[in-house]
Amino acid sequence: MFTINAEVRKEQGKGASRRLRTANKFPAIIYGGSEAPIAIELDHDQVMNMQAKAEFYSEVLTLVVDGKEVKVKAQAVQRHAYKPKLTHIDFVRA
């Protein structure tokens, strides 16, 4: 089982996302279920190491968002065109 630490995003938009990526983080979102969507930010290196394993895409993951655990599955992963970097992930509540 994978456990990923996340923080709720305070800013949104292109400029805020670029600042996150410069700080070695990237934006993501959690949606689905009866709760409202949550915009989050993740540590790039931590997630990059986890997503190298095939189980990352098929198993239920645990996101710890500000101390609260959320069970999710990776829905869509966006990558940089030619660099080995993640730019965004969509998570669906499990």
UniProtKB/Swiss-Prot annotation:
One annotated Gene Ontology cellular component of this protein: cytosolic large ribosomal subunit
Gene Ontology biological-process annotations: translation
Keyword rRNA-binding: yes
Record keywords, A-Z: Ribonucleoprotein, Ribosomal protein, RNA-binding, rRNA-binding
A molecular function (GO) term: structural constituent of ribosome
UniProt-listed InterPro entries: Rbsml_bL25/Gln-tRNA_synth_N, Ribosomal_bL25/Gln-tRNA_synth, Ribosomal_bL25_short, Ribosomal_L25_dom, Ribosomal_uL5_bac-type
Pfam families: Ribosomal_L25p
Subunit and partners: Part of the 50S ribosomal subunit; part of the 5S rRNA/L5/L18/L25 subcomplex. Contacts the 5S rRNA. Binds to the 5S rRNA independently of L5 and L18.
Xref: HAMAP family: Ribosomal_bL25
Function in brief: This is one of the proteins that binds to the 5S RNA in the ribosome where it forms part of the central protuberance.
Similarity section: Belongs to the bacterial ribosomal protein bL25 family.
Protein name as it appears in the record: Large ribosomal subunit protein bL25
Organism: Salmonella gallinarum (strain 287/91 / NCTC 13346)
Organism phylogeny: Bacteria, Pseudomonadati, Pseudomonadota, Gammaproteobacteria, Enterobacterales
Gene: rplY
